[in-house]
Amino acid sequence: MALSIFVGTGVPDCPSETDVLDCPQPELTRYGEIADKYIKQLNDFYEHLSVEKYVIMPNHIHLLLWLKENKNKTDNGQSRTPVPTNIERAKSVCSQFVSTFKRFCNKEYGENIWQARFNDHIIRNRDDYEEHVKYIYENPIRWYYDELYTEE
């Protein structure tokens, strides 16, 4: 099961440091570098989650998370711990991931820059997955046309 996550900063005007059309991703600010570090660390921390794709934008982050199968099985092949296969459990695991991510980042930032809520979307099929991968990949290009984009 895969989920697409959007986490906003709550900072409406946080321009990138370079023209996004000249690079595959906007140059990361100090905040972006810290966010990148914790996305990678938390990817290793959560047993049932892997970060498949992500992009750090000037005022938000998109993540595509994959819920992994539990490899901790009993002799008869049953899971020892519940695998997040239903929607409620999947959203709970993602909420934990996002909450931990924001807490770690905010501690290092010395301030809270994240919006309280985030948006999630359960990936329903292969086409839905590919659409979200494409969206994440193309998001830096679309940023140039965003109403919040500003040039320095």
State the predicted function of each range.
Residues 1-152:
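Short catalytic/metal-binding and nucleic-acid-binding patches
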